[in-house]
From Swiss-Prot:
Its main location: cytoplasm. [4Fe-4S] cluster 1 binds at C9, C23, C26, C32. One of its GO terms (cellular component) is cytosol. This is Cytosolic Fe-S cluster assembly factor Nubp1 homolog. The keyword Magnesium does not apply. Binds 4 [4Fe-4S] clusters per heterotetramer. Contains two stable clusters in the N-termini of Nubp1 and two labile, bridging clusters between subunits of the Nubp1-Nubp2 heterotetramer. ATP binds at G63, K64, G65, G66, V67, G68, K69, S70.
Length: 310
């Protein structure tokens, strides 16, 4: 039997497991430092079984909070579902402390039902379903105040106990940064026998304070061996509804996402404008992807690149 981990345990999946100073004196140190002795998490087998009919998993990541990652997840889901009606799409909201997808996808107040095959995700459209902790709270104002292990347990339940059915693509809306949630979901979904099934998209805004954290997110993906489909620059410009002039709300001091992508050797999928119509529609849970405007034209290019890369 393994002993409880030390307070600053790097985690058994870490390359530093059993090797850093926090591991000194831990009775599990010899197990963690020797790959041949590491125990397989039984949850991985459960997740693999539950995900066997999900062709592709796509992590939507952002190094910095407030860059519109959840909104981009919603826009991608809506546009993909409309453009590829024969495909099935799912959204998993693993931002445990700040779930946004029920509101953004117009599913506030919906309930999750349980059957013999697990939790049934909430249907959004004919070919879109959603699972979020937001459906399990008593009120939309309830705070989720959980430490890492409890968050990880919830994520494992979402991955192993939700009856997703046959999905062509599952989009995972993640919290900002590289926290417990990210390490947990990657450890469960990464399959060395099928590395092409898990990918990532990284969302940023043009200013350097966001790009600084995006570089860290890119390095996280590279260290975790997650292929990056590309970067989406959100809120790249704003077009005035009165005069029609375009301006930069977040000026790109160092060349924005385009320069950063060249520097980090990752693709730039495209740029989305700061669109008041998107803000209003997401607050109301409405779909604007049938309209033809600057946002949907950009989405068409981005979604085409995503589907051709999978």
């Amino acid at each position: 039997m393994q002993a409880p981990p030390p307070e600053h345990c790097p985690g058994v999946e870490s390359e530093q497991a059993g090797l850093v100073s926090a591991c000194a004196g831990c009775p599990n140190q010899s197990i963690c430092s020797d790959p041949s002795k590491k125990l397989e998490d039984p949850g991985k087998a459960l997740v693999a079984a539950a995900m066997k009919d999900v062709k592709h998993k796509l992590l939507i990541l952002s190094g910095k909070g407030g860059v519109g990652k959840s909104t981009v997840t919603t826009l991608l889901t809506r546009y993909l579902a409309r453009s590829y009606p024969d495909n099935n799409f799912g959204v998993l909201d693993i931002d445990i402390c700040g779930p946004s997808q029920p509101r953004l996808l117009g599913a506030l107040g919906e309930n999750v039902h349980q059957s013999g095959s697990g939790w049934s995700p909430v249907g959004i459209d004919d070919n879109v379903c959603l699972m979020s902790i937001g459906f399990l709270l008593g009120s939309v104002d309830d705070a989720v105040i959980w430490r890492g292990p409890k968050k990880n347990g919830m994520i494992r339940q979402f991955l192993s106990e939700v009856d997703w059915g046959n999905l062509d693509l599952l989009l995972l809306d993640t919290p900002p940064g590289t926290s417990d949630e990210h390490l947990s979901v990657v450890s469960y979904l990464r399959d060395d026998n099928a590395p092409e099934s898990l990918h990532a998209i990284i969302v940023t805004t043009p200013q350097e304070v966001a790009l600084l954290d995006v570089r860290k997110e890119i390095n996280f993906c590279k260290k975790q061996r997650i292929p990056i489909l590309g970067v989406i620059e959100n809120m790249s410009s704003f077009r005035c509804g009165h005069c029609g002039n375009s301006s930069e709300i977040f000026p790109a001091k160092t060349g924005g996402a385009a320069a950063m992508c060249i520097e980090m050797d990752v693709p730039l999928l495209g740029s989305l404008p700061l669109d008041p119509l998107v803000t209003r529609s997401c607050d109301a849970g409405e779909d604007i992807t049938a309209m033809r405007n600057e946002t949907t034209e950009a989405l068409a290019t981005i979604c085409s690149k995503i589907m051709s890369s999978l």
